[in-house]
Every structure is written in structure tokens, then in C-alpha cells.
Amino acid sequence: MSRKIVEFRNVSFRYDEEGPWVLKNCSFEIYEDEWLAIIGHNGSGKSTIAKLLNGLLFPQEGEIYIDGIKVDENSIWDIRKEVGMVFQNPDNQFVGATVQDDVAFGMENRGIPREIMKKRIDETLQAVRMQDYLLTEPHRLSGGQKQRVAIASVLAISPKILILDEATAMLDPVGRKEIMQTVNSIQDSQGLSLITITHDLKEITRADRVIVLNNGERWDEATPSQLFKRKDALREIGLDVPFVAHLSDAFRNNGITIEHSPLSHEQLLEELWTYHSKM
């Protein structure tokens, strides 16, 4: 098994002393090179986890470790070298006058030599398919393009962990598709631990593992295919599986054998082709 890169140990958090607990005794691990999805309805605590992982917040109870380092006020800058984040609003993340300047910004703050910076700018923009927009100003980019630049800016500082906190929530369908294609490509090629935080179950189909939060507690953990079989239980906590899972059930209910649990329309077509070839 791969090495643990993140440990949440009995973590509880609330935003003020008299307020409700946003997270309650939450424990989980994340491993090197793993894609973990964290899902839940609005207010379930998932975005709070993202902020705790990056040292933007600290737990009132429990402990968090990133690559063996305890997250606290003394380690915050070491932690942020290891953890990169992309948030919901692409307009709030652009700090440079051009795409090139934005990707360079984090590296400049770390004193990375200019030749290395230039190489990383080229590599990361190619990784997110934005190499043709090097000198483009941010207002000329779509929301999806801005988010891809935000991902490149994080990759340029070479984190061990990349967190996408509802990174597609403010995008149109085209932008969402662009980002998920980018995420799939990065996970295949970059060799880092990826954490995607979302309420949209269509975005978790490629994840290795899924943690489900409900009212601040860890409600379930499963692979995507296992989770999609629990449609009724998910619906009770305000979540719904992708249309392809409902479609698969409809075929089964009409006597068509679907042996596996398809996670995409392409996989469903393969199942139907297999069924047809056996007739």
C-alpha cells in the first residue's frame, strides 16, 4: 500500500465557541498518488476540510498531519509548500496581468530561479492545455480557462497534494467538462495526491475512493461504483447519483443484463454491446 500523505485524527471544528460543530470527530487518511473525492450536501463540512488541510483553519479538537508534519501555527508555511488549492471563483484567484504572470507569481514568492520558472510555466500550461494563452489578459479568458490557469499556477509550485474545492461550481457545462478533462489528465501524469471536493457526483467517477459527509460526520466511504448502488440512501442526505446509474437500473428492470456498474455513458455502451453480442 502507498504511504499515507494525509491523516485526519478525530478532528472536530466549529467557527465560534458557541456555534454548532461543523465537523464532528472526523478521521480518514489519504495516500500518495491517490485520488480521493469528498462529497456532501451544502453545509456538510466538506469545504471546511479543505481549509483545515491548507492551514487556513485549525481544529479545536483532534490532529491533522500532512506528510508526517502536524498542521499548526508553527508549521503553516511548510504545509503550504506541500498543499495547493483551487477554489470556486476563478476571478478571485487571478493575481497576474497575464496568464504567464499568474503562473509565475507563486514561484517568485518562493525565490525559484528564473530559468526553472520559465521551464515550469511552459510545462504546467501544456499540462492544462493553455500554452497558447501565455500573454493573454485574464478578462479575455472564459471561466473554465481561468480555472485551468489556476490549476497550472498551483502545479508550478510542485505540491504533493492538489485540492480542488468545488472548482467547477461556478462554471457552465463546457467549463466543467474542460476542468474534469484537465483533472483526469493531471492525475494520470503528474504523480500527486488529488482531493476533489464537490456535491456533484458526476465529478467523482474517476476517483479511487470517495468519502461522504453528512452534517459534519463521515457518513460513508466507498469506491464510486459501490457508492452508486446506494441511490436511495444518498437521496435521503440530499445527493443523487449520475443519470447513467439510473439508466443502468432501468435497463436491468427491463430484463437487460448489466453485469457491472457503469460510471460513464461510454462504459454503459460497452455493457450494452457485451449484452447484445451474447444474444
UniProtKB/Swiss-Prot annotation:
Keywords: ATP-binding, Cell membrane, Membrane, Nucleotide-binding, Translocase, Transport. This is Energy-coupling factor transporter ATP-binding protein EcfA1. Residues 6-240 form the ABC transporter domain. Forms a stable energy-coupling factor (ECF) transporter complex composed of 2 membrane-embedded substrate-binding proteins (S component), 2 ATP-binding proteins (A component) and 2 transmembrane proteins (T component). It comes from the Bacteria. Gene3D superfamilies: P-loop containing nucleotide triphosphate hydrolases. ATP-binding (A) component of a common energy-coupling factor (ECF) ABC-transporter complex. Unlike classic ABC transporters this ECF transporter provides the energy necessary to transport a number of different substrates. The keyword Hydrolase does not apply. The gene is ecfA1. It is found in: Cell membrane.
